Structure formats: structure tokens, C-alpha cells
């Protein structure tokens, strides 16, 4: 695909969609351009001319000149319909929809093999951190024993404010909502569901396991109380929402998402604000640490662009 012009059909023009548009506009040397953008709301004010937009998905899916579909919408069910139909029509697909991918992983892999088209989703795991590519390429010949990390920027922002500025949990959450890091109904983030969907994706690339999301335990930061926060402050610890997967002594894999006390020795201790951080442990290379922005238009768009 890299040797020919990529004609992109983009679904969604929110934060990340606009970020991708800007990034592509600033890199004219790339052999890629957005031909059409499909959105739902005709009346919504947008920062570029309305001639770029279409409102029927068939305008993209039925266009034979479009050879790459980029899916960046919130609706997981609609995203699955778009992605599967694009693959059936022989179009390459890039997606950032971690919920859709986690819930339909097995089906999507079957479709990818059947129609022999690229299906890439680096942005669905840790935004700007190229963790999937490293798991697939760098660790291909090493034995991965453990992977854990902060993979949700919204909750990390809330926890950072709680400890660095001594804000209460409700105050920190309200600030995250005001800045657009958390939704008005933030349970997907604060309940650990977003992190769980990302862990499902990491499990597939770290250990070759395709696991339904409901099989992974997730406990979110919404379960934290004043006692845990006070204890962490007294002991000079931080609390981080950590997604963890590791091989057990019985050669099985344990996986879960939950808040964790971290001390100064942990690499995750320094991962604050909306940043993500991932630690891998392998048989030969031992520990390695990756960090990068886990939220925002341009960081996430950079991962979409790399795909």
C-alpha cells in the first residue's frame, strides 16, 4: 500500500478526525489525501468547508477510487458495520475504536484473512505509543512474560490532579470534564472499561490470545475512597489505574485492570497528566518502558497516520 497513492475515506470528524486532517495537511510529501469525510450531523459547524463532507456511508464505501477507510467514530456498532463492509469491498482499514475491536476481535481477524486487506489499529491501544508494532516486530523473537501500563489518559489526569494538587476525586473529575478529557458520563473511563478494551488488544499481540472483554476483570478509579487516597499520601505513593497481563507459573495468562499503589521505584510513578506508560518484561531483554501522550487530537492522529 505504501508505494501507491492512498485515497482516504474518513468516517468521523471529531477531535481525532480533525487532528488527522491537520496532520495530513502539514505533510504534503505523504502520498495520502482525504477524498471524502462522512459525518452524521449536517447542521454542525465545522472548521473546514462543507464541500468536504458527505452524509451517507455509501458515498465512501461505494467509491472505487477510495482504497483506504479510516474509521474514527464513537459508535462501536456503526463502526463495526463500516469496517466489515469496507473489508468486504477490498478496502484497507485503519481504526481507533478500541471498544469495537475488542468486542469483535475474532470476527475482524477472520474477515481480514478472508478478504486479504490490511486492518490496522495502533491508535486503539495507547494513542501515540507504538506498542502494537513493537510487540509484533521487536519482541517477535523474545519471550514476553509480562506487560502492564497506564493506558487511559483521562483517569491518569484525574489521579494526577488528586495527588499533585490535593484535589478531591469529584473536583478532579469535574476539571477533566471541563477540559474535554472525560465525558459527561465518564464511566467508560473511570470504571476501567476503556482500559479493559485496550488490554484485550494488547493481549492478542503480546500473548496471541483473543479474549472476550467480559472475561477480564476491571475495577475502576470510581471505586476509590478517601481511605485509599489518604493512605497513598501518607506513604508517599501514587495510585494509578493499571492494565496488567502476565504469564503464571502454570503457563497460563492472568489479565485484569485495577487501581494500583505505585512507589518511586516504579517507572509508572512518573507517568502523569494525560500520558500513557507501558512496561514490558521479557525473558532476554528484561524490562523496557514506553511513554507518550495518551489523549489529544495530534498524538492519536499520529498513530492513525503511522498505520
What label would you give each PLM region?
Residues 80-85, 98-136:
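Rossmann-fold NAD(P)-binding glycine/threonine-rich loop
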Residues 137-202:
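Conserved anion/nucleotide-ligand pocket segment
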Residues 287-307:
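C-terminal, non-catalytic macromolecule-binding modules
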Residues 173-270, 275:
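Substrate-binding/catalytic subdomain of NAD(P)-dependent oxidoreductase enzymes
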Residues 53-55, 71, 94-96, 119-123, ...:
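General beta-strand structural signal in soluble alpha/beta enzymes
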Residues 7-22:
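Glycine-rich adenosine-cofactor-binding loop
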Residues 55-96, 102:
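Rossmann-fold NAD(P) dinucleotide-binding segment
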Amino acid at each position: 500500500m505504501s508505494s501507491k497513492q492512498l485515497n482516504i475515506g474518513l468516517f468521523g470528524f471529531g477531535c481525532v478526525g480533525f487532528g488527522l486532517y491537520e496532520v495530513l495537511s502539514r505533510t504534503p510529501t505523504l502520498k495520502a489525501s482525504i477524498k471524502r469525510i462522512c459525518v452524521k450531523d449536517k447542521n454542525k459547524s465545522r472548521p473546514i468547508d462543507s464541500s468536504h463532507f458527505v452524509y451517507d456511508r455509501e458515498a465512501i464505501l461505494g467509491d472505487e477510487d477510495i482504497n483506504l477507510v479510516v474509521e474514527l467514530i464513537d459508535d462501536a456498532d456503526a463502526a463495526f458495520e463500516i469496517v466489515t463492509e469496507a473489508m468486504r469491498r477490498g478496502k484497507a482499514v485503519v481504526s481507533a475504536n478500541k471498544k469495537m475491536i475488542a468486542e469483535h476481535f475474532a470476527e475482524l481477524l477472520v474477515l481480514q484473512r478472508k478478504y486479504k486487506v490490511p486492518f490496522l489499529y495502533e491508535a486503539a491501544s495507547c494513542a501515540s505509543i507504538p506498542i502494537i508494532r513493537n510487540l509484533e516486530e521487536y519482541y517477535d523473537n523474545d519471550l514476553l512474560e509480562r506487560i502492564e501500563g497506564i493506558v487511559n489518559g483521562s483517569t491518569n489526569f484525574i489521579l494526577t490532579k488528586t495527588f499533585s494538587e490535593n484535589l478531591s476525586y469529584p473536583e478532579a473529575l469535574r476539571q477533566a470534564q471541563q477540559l474535554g478529557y472525560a465525558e459527561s458520563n465518564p464511566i467508560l473511563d473511570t470504571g476501567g472499561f476503556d482500559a479493559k478494551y485496550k488490554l484485550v488488544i494488547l493481549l492478542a499481540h503480546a500473548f496471541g490470545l483473543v479474549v472476550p472483554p467480559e472475561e477480564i476483570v476491571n475495577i475502576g478509579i470510581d471505586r476509590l475512597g478517601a481511605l485509599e487516597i489518604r493512605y497513598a499520601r501518607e506513604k508517599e505513593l501514587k495510585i494509578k489505574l493499571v492494565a496488567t497481563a502476565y504469564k503464571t507459573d502454570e503457563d497460563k495468562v492472568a489479565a485484569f485492570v485495577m487501581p494500583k499503589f505505585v512507589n518511586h521505584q516504579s517507572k509508572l510513578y512518573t507517568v502523569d497528566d494525560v500520558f500513557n506508560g507501558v512496561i514490558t518484561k521479557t525473558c532476554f531483554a528484561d524490562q523496557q518502558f514506553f511513554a507518550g501522550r495518551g489523549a489529544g487530537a495530534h498524538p492519536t492522529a499520529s498513530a492513525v497516520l503511522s498505520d
